[in-house]
Amino acid sequence: MKNANFSIVVIFLALLTLLCAFVALGVGRFYIPFNDVFSVLAHSFGYGEGAASNITNVIENLRIPRIIAAILVGAALSVSGAAYQGVFKNQLVSPDLLGVSAGACVGAATAIIFDLSLLWIQIFAFGFGLAAVAITLAIPKMMGRTSTLMLVLSGIIVSGLMGSIIGFLKYVADPETKLPDIVYWQLGSLAKLDSDNLKYIAPVMIICAILLIAMSWRINLLSLGDESAARLGVNVSFERAVIIICATLLTGCSVCISGIVAWVGLLMPHLARMLVGANNIKSMPASIFMGAIFLLFVDTLARSISVSEVPLGVLTGFIGTVFFVWVLWRNKKVA
């Protein structure tokens, strides 16, 4: 019965994702009636006469790539957050724990200061993000202490270092041309999405997400502790490394697409566990759809509520803090 309920939940979340995507095609500063949205979609599959050329252009060249990006980023941040929380046995862990977001921000800020193209900004962000994680992983090995706690402390050290570098880059950046771009990128947005680059990033994200879902039962074992997992036949160091690499790649790719979008990787796994339970085999697939739905909603809101687009991080931060206040209030008797 529980498996049947879980299947119903996943099917419902998948259908809700499709419904939100359809609604997002019509909603925005340029409102498009839903019958026109349906006409454009039907025409793309060879049915009907389509809609006016300007409507078709907005849907096919602007909104569809952006909606796909929102789904990918939301799902990636959510499932990587769930993986990190399982591996590190801490439900307050987020995908930027090991410094990938801070490192990516340094890379993007460097590229912006040197006036490089959007493609190079994304390449710098991805490369610096992975470099930051590599430094985080190297510190415990250099010190001969590879415990989970040491890894977390190394992530804090590297994130602090990257934060200082970001502060320096913002200090030396041109306040008229470069600084606003750096700040806006830090807050997260899909406004400058390059659909051509998305074609190369999306397969990496999908493969990493599939690997994490396939290893969800191993994450269950790792969450029992290193000694217990080893007694059950788990190669703790290897499998933890694979999970961290996949989750880091997902986070790095997400940051390349949208900049830094906070709270998604922390908030959505909590909601998924509240919905389907703490078993990662169930909560991780649910978190993928919930992350996609959440960022679809936030992005649609960001491009609809004002003339100038609101950064995603502003909205996710507001929603995230309200949610955790509600969680604290809900659990006040337990506390």
Regions found by a protein language model. Name each.
Residues 1-335:
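Alpha-helical transmembrane segments in inner-membrane proteins
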